[in-house]
UniProtKB/Swiss-Prot annotation:
UniProt cross-references to PANTHER family, sorted A to Z: OS08G0374000 PROTEIN-RELATED, STRESS-INDUCED PROTEIN SAM22
Record gene name: BETV1L
Keywords: Allergen, Cytoplasm, Pathogenesis-related protein, Plant defense
Protein name: Major pollen allergen Bet v 1-L
Subunit structure: Interacts with brassinosteroids such as brassinolide and 24-epicastasterone.
Amino acid sequence: MGVFNYETEATSVIPAARMFKAFILDGDKLVPKVAPQAISSVENIEGNGGPGTIKKINFPEGFPFKYVKDRVDEVDHTNFKYNYSVIEGGPVGDTLEKISNEIKIVATPDGGCVLKISNKYHTKGNHEVKAEQVKASKEMGETLLRAVESYLLAHSDAYN
């Protein structure tokens, strides 16, 4: 087994606490509403949203795969940090054991925030992670972030 690390950052004009509430804490409800072209629904399979919770994320028809199951590993309300692992479905299977993800939302001096994202692809055997896979994951994250950001800009009273 190998581990391939990928890190990226994305900035937003939304304050860190507000982004954490909307994108992380209420993302299961908000994201399918604001980005149905990317995620059709999220089902809570087990747990209360904290560590150990299992969620099934369903994708719309025509998407490369039907679903993924995520396991919540950590929710840090003080430091706006969220860790989860993709444990089933989607790219996980013959070549990947899991994908561990960490999202940390940090306030910026201008009142916005930066999302620091770390992805660890745990491969099976000697398999390597393809650049297209990383690119698709980054594009999906950017799509979801911008959809949430647009919603928050249009609804200034939400998630304060």
